[in-house]
Amino acid sequence: MKSMNRMKAIRRITTLVMLFIIIFCFAVTGFDMNVIIKRGSQAVLFIKRMFPPDTGYCGKIIEPLIKTVQMSIAGTFIGAVFGLFTAFLYAGNLIKKSYVRIVVRVIVQCVRTIPVLILALVATFIWGLGAAAGTIAIAVSTWAVMARIGGEDIESLTLKPYEAVTAIGAGKFKAFSRTVIVELLPGYLSNSLYVLEANIRHAAILGYVGAGGIGLLLNEKISWREYSRVGMILVMLFVAVLVIEGISTFLKAYLDGRIKRNTTANVIISVCIMVFFVYSLSAVKDVSTSKLGIKVVGAIMHGITHPDWEYMFMTGKSGVMYLMLETIAIAVAGTCAGAVFAVILTLINSRKFIPAPMAFIGRLVVMAIRTVPVYVYGLIFIRVTGPGSFAGVLTMMMCSIGLLTKRFTVAVDNWSMAAWNACKCAGTGFIARLRYVAVPELKIQFKDAVMYRLDVNVRSASTLGLVGAGGIGAPLIVYMNNYRWDAVGSILIVLFVVVLLIELLSKCLKRIH
């Protein structure tokens, strides 16, 4: 009884502390509803400039759009393959030598900390401008993400079947491929498809730093204020995301066993995937490094390992610590605001609560929200709030709404409604069912999704300075362009520590709740 009361007290204190942190983050960013009410129409006016889109420009969008899809597929495939091999070294239950596991985990976490836009900028220094740099950046980012996800999935597996097969005389490799790989692969491939969907959106903004794809065209048209053509680019990007997501949904259903599998279907799907991958490799042709590129790699490594300690601990609003605090505040406030709207949208987005046709329309709306690149949202909200972290909060909110609504909807779609239906038959009201049935049964999945999104948003918020939306992104890009790698190292080290602390916080919250 005492332990139960103690846990309840810990949960209440944790909840109060989290509420205080959230309120503090909103205050740091200067969030003001009055500004949104008075100047919200400016965002609407900006969006109106994009519509109706310039349909005559469609023909010039197709080629860079195809290049964007190629970059995403090739980068995801390469990163996922290397990530699978790294996952075996990442997992604690496979590698008995702790120093190997520690080194691998540190490298993976360091790379995972770096936003893909920053990876793309580094890649352009080494391999030059173009789609090859973007593909390599996506591959490296995917490798780090999938190595971590795969390693954690392996740790959750039981190795008893593997041990049993080796005990009866089977070779270790054969036993491993017939037990661990068979159990791991469906979930790993499904996660790879989620990453592919995200990479399509990442690839759409890499052109901002000259890393190829439709982002080059989008950045150009925004700079020239040809907003009707910007609208056409976004429409075409939405169509591409819709097609990719449709294919991804089919493949996930196939992997999960919801669609009947057979040998013929396996062969056809495998051949199609390989054909798409080989075709996508044309995006990375003529990859070569110059002597300057090799020097840049050396300078980057030297700068990161020899950071500017004075700059790292400098006080004032131009110091790393304050800018990182602002970045964290943007990420926390944006994630929380996005989560609130995502819950509301989930209720009108799931077939379990509303008719299927209405849910389909809702999902299209959410997909459209997810399609818009992050810096386009930044430009829209700067018209409302002016430059600064307030615009960053609204930008992170919109980015969070799209992805959290999808994660929440997946959780609801997989939710057994036995208790919900029983309470409904007993005459319990809708609000009461939400409070006493839905919330207790779904809160863990929702909380995990929010913490994952917060982790992503901290890295994403570190690039918002590109469009004047606050955070540490502006000095990070400036120092990279000026080859101040010691200052870049200072920023990345602090960013790494912050991401690591968020991960530890997430694990602690799982234990408490």
Go through each PLM region and give its residues.
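N-terminal, non-cleaved signal-anchor transmembrane helix
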Residues: 1-73, 77, 89, 246-336, ...
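A structural signal for multi-pass alpha-helical bundles of membrane permease subunits
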Residues: 25-34, 120-127, 197, 279-288, ...
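Alpha-helical membrane-interface segments at transmembrane helix boundaries
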Residues: 62-70, 104-111, 197, 219, ...
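Hydrophobic positions within alpha-helical transmembrane segments of bacterial inner-membrane proteins
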Residues: 76-88, 92, 117, 187, ...
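Cytoplasmic-entry segments and transmembrane alpha-helices of multi-pass inner-membrane transporters
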Residues: 85-120, 149, 344-378
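Generic hydrophobic transmembrane alpha-helix motif, especially the helices
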Residues: 108-142, 366-397
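Membrane-cytosol interface at the C-terminal ends of specific transmembrane alpha-helices
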Residues: 129-195, 202, 246, 387-438, ...
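Hydrophobic alpha-helical transmembrane segments of polytopic membrane proteins
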Residues: 214-251, 472-508
